[in-house]
Regions:
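Conserved helix-turn-beta segment immediately C-terminal to the redox Cys motif
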Residues: 92-113
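Short active-site neighborhood of thiol/selenol oxidoreductases, capturing the structured segment around
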Residues: 68-96
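Short, Lys/Arg-rich N-terminal segment immediately upstream of the first membrane anchor
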Residues: 1-9
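Short, surface-exposed patches at the edges or C-terminal ends of soluble domains, predominantly
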Residues: 96-97, 101, 147-148, 187-193
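N-terminal "domain-start" segment that seeds a small globular fold
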Residues: 21-24, 32-68, 90
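Hydrophobic membrane-insertion alpha-helices, especially the h-region
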Residues: 10-30
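Short, internal strand/loop/helix patches
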Residues: 110-116, 120-157, 162
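Thiol-/selenol-based redox modules, centered on thioredoxin-like
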Residues: 155-193
Length: 193
């Protein structure tokens, strides 16, 4: 009789341990070990930490030539050092396609081109409707360039992501797969709600 009681108690203890041990192990791994430390997360781009406040730069709309603000929307930014060559046109096209691929969320994303010269952009108005740009004619141009120059990881060939509050937060290398950028923006928009 005593062995039956002992056996049933051991079974009960075994069942309890099956549920308690995984909880204790996960608690230990999360709070007291280096488990997953240094994990880059699920983002495809490089997270800029700490974020860089860009303020509220006034930018021009490519088609209407009106001054607008980029705040309130996620913004994909890239630099054009000289004239807009084939690489520049490919980047304009790629960013337009990224925005369109977001479907119903495309209105939450803007595209910003930062040009180092005073180029006439009128030839691109039909192909890249809604594109924004900032160049030396803009009053906020020098301040924006200074903030980027202060960033140690500046890569003029990369694409950058600015959050709706005006903080530079992510960087995508020139040869990055646009699908990764789309996934990141979808996740950010979803988590913003």
């Amino acid at each position: 009789m005593e062995s039956k009681i002992l056996r049933s108690r051991l079974i009960l203890l075994g069942v309890a341990l099956v549920f308690i041990i995984p909880i204790l192990v996960s608690w230990y791994l999360v709070f007291f070990s280096d488990f997953k430390k240094g994990d880059g997360g699920t983002q495809k781009g490089e997270l800029i930490s700490p974020v860089i406040p860009l303020g509220e730069p006034e930018v021009f709309n490519l088609k209407s030539k009106t001054i607008e603000s980029i705040n309130g929307k996620w913004t994909l930014l890239f630099f054009v050092e000289n004239e807009c060559n084939q690489l520049c046109e490919d980047k304009l096209y790629q960013l337009r396609q990224i925005r369109l691929a977001l479907g119903k969320d495309r209105d939450k994303v803007d595209r910003l081109l930062v040009s180092k010269n005073k180029q006439q952009w009128s030839q691109y108005t039909n192909s890249f409707n809604g594109q924004k740009y900032i160049d030396p004619r803009s009053r906020d141009y020098n301040g924006l360039i200074k903030k980027f120059n202060d960033y140690a990881g500046l890569d003029l060939k990369a694409t950058y992501l600015i959050d709706p509050y005006g903080f530079l937060m992510m960087k995508y290398p020139q040869d990055d797969n646009p699908m990764g950028t789309i996934k990141d923006i979808e996740r950010l928009i979803k988590n913003q709600k």
